[in-house]
Regions:
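Short, structured beta-strand/loop micro-motifs enriched in basic residues and often containing a Trp
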Residues: 71-84
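Exposed boundary/loop context
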Residues: 9-10, 89
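Basic polycationic patches enriched in arginine
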Residues: 2, 22-23
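Bacterial N-terminal signal peptides that target proteins for export
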Residues: 1-9
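Sequence context surrounding c-type heme c attachment/ligation sites in exported
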Residues: 5, 26-37, 45-70, 90-184
Length: 184
């Protein structure tokens, strides 16, 4: 098994591509850069430059609350391909899968908390950003088969510096670069 993994890594380095060691290593869906130095991943790689049309009509997959610096509430939406794959637990995600993460400032609800008599209700405040992951294993081979997009609430694309943080973080996720799971 170890020799198989080493051969796959060596082949990936030689061809300058990306290899998903998911099946060979038993680590379902992990992504690995092909060559040393590819860890920056998103630098120089193509990005998602336009928000997909109709994404607000997609199906909800999950909701997340982020503490720390982000302190946000987010909802994860998926197109039909991503939604079906996530529900079925299909890894890796098929090409054509698109995920949209809509992030909002996490705020206390004064109105709700007056009813409850204590601070316990958090709601989505102002939108902070919209992020996309588009699966195209050929176009985005340098970043695990995923293209990343980051947009302001009014649709302006993110900076190269913002986009450069996407792949290094997502390659650590054990489900083909996706942190979230389907929530029925």
């Amino acid at each position: 098994m170890r020799q198989t993994i080493l051969l796959l890594v060596a082949a990936a380095v030689l061809i300058g591509g990306l290899v998903c060691l998911r099946r060979a290593s038993g680590q379902a869906g992990t992504m690995a850069p092909a060559a040393a130095g590819a860890g920056a991943g998103a630098v120089g790689a193509p990005h998602v430059t336009e928000m997909p049309k109709g994404f607000r009509e997609w199906k909800m997959i999950s909701i997340a609350h982020e503490e720390g610096n982000l302190h946000s509430i987010g909802v994860l939406l998926g197109n039909d391909a991503a939604y079906r794959a996530m529900r079925a637990g299909t890894l890796p995600y098929p090409d054509g899968s698109v995920l949209a993460a809509l992030h909002y400032k996490d705020v206390l609800s004064d109105e709700n908390n007056k009813v409850f008599g204590q601070e316990q209700s958090h709601v989505a405040g102002t939108p902070t950003n919209i992020q996309f992951m588009v699966k195209d294993s050929k176009k985005y081979a340098a970043t695990g088969g995923w293209g990343f997009g980051h947009f302001s609430p009014d649709g302006k694309p993110g900076t190269d510096a913002q986009l450069a943080t996407c792949f290094p973080c997502h390659q650590k996720a054990t489900r083909d670069g996706v942190f979230s799971q389907y929530v029925p």
